[in-house]
Amino acid sequence: MQQPIIGVGHSMGGCQIATLSVTSRRMFSTMILLDPAIGPPDMGLATLDLGQLTLRRRTQWPTREDAEKALRTSFSTWDSQVLNLLIKHSIHSDKQSIEMEDGPVSLVTGRYQELVNYIKPSFIRSGKVNGQELIHQTGPVDMYHMLGLVTCSALYLCGGESTLSVPRVRDLWLNRTAKLSYSKEPGETRKVDERIVPDTGHFLPMEEPKKCADIIADWIEKDKCIAWNCCVGKRGKTWCELSNASKEMSAEAWMKYLQSKL
């Protein structure tokens, strides 16, 4: 794929973008992780109450008006345009109310789809819905252990009031990310940094989309690693276009140079 490719992800999406940087080496020229769900074992999904919160979450309302009122209350800190989009696309009419002018509505995405992000659905393999060991998803902790293998520059964009990206965790991210020089090319540099959006929480891209967009644009504009990756791609294409004789001459010259270095 032609570079630059820039990875941007929020929460679990940030974890998945970072994982792609490791499993699909050199896919991204840079990535921006917004309050990513990446953390040490003591902050893994098993330590949070996300499963319980999901099961308690309401998913149905008598009318669309009731649903809209509930969502506006729950997400009152969100930017108005973002909240309007959420209301527009997250609610649908129940089957029995399609022919009615106003009837029961439900969330488009139910509890199950969210719950399996946190807890593994063991009943699928065992066929038993009870009596099974409770196994939480390990992706955020797995990615924490792989941070040293990240293959591109990374910006951690975090909410100042987020309980997920607390200072201790941010320090761990910065100290571990891309430190093992995995799949690194000669002359390549990888920049790792953080930016904080004050007075926002874990939902910072929904609360302050303009501020987040400005920070992301500034990072992309100033990240020299993006230009470096594009140049590498062009050099690689030029090499492929050389004749075999020219490639052999270059290889011989390189080996001669190495003799003076090794």
UniProtKB/Swiss-Prot annotation:
Tell me the InterPro entries matching this sequence.
AB_hydrolase_1 (IPR000073), AB_hydrolase_fold (IPR029058)
Q: What else is known?
A: Gene clusters encoding host-selective toxins (HSTs) are localized on conditionally dispensable chromosomes (CDCs), also called supernumerary chromosomes, where they are present in multiple copies. The CDCs are not essential for saprophytic growth but controls host-selective pathogenicity.
Q: In which pathway does it act?
A: Mycotoxin biosynthesis
Please give the function described in this protein's UniProt entry.
Answer: Abhydrolase domain-containing protein; part of the gene clusters that mediate the biosynthesis of the host-selective toxins (HSTs) AK-toxins responsible for Japanese pear black spot disease by the Japanese pear pathotype. AK-toxins are esters of 9,10-epoxy 8-hydroxy 9-methyldecatrienoic acid (EDA). On cellular level, AK-toxins affect plasma membrane of susceptible cells and cause a sudden increase in loss of K(+) after a few minutes of toxin treatment.
- Please name the source species: Alternaria alternata (Alternaria rot fungus)
Pfam families in the record, alphabetically?
A: Abhydrolase_6
Q: Which Gene3D superfamilies match?
A: alpha/beta hydrolase (3.40.50.1820)
Q: What happens when the gene is disrupted?
A: Abolishes the production of AK-toxin and impairs the pathogenicity.
Q: What is the protein name for this chain?
A: Abhydrolase domain-containing protein AKT2
Localized where?
Peroxisome
Q: Which family does it belong to?
A: Belongs to the AB hydrolase superfamily. AKT2 hydrolase family.
> What molecular functions are annotated in GO for this chain?
hydrolase activity
Reported EC number(s) for this entry are 3.1.1.-
Grouped into one coarse class, the protein's main location is other
Identify which top EC class this enzyme belongs to. Answer: hydrolase
Q: Enumerate the transmembrane spans.
A: none
Q: Which UniProt keywords apply?
A: Hydrolase, Peroxisome, Virulence
A GO cellular component annotation in the UniProt record: peroxisome
Coiled-coil features, chain-numbered ranges: none
In chain numbering, motif Peroxisomal targeting signal type 1 lies across 260-262
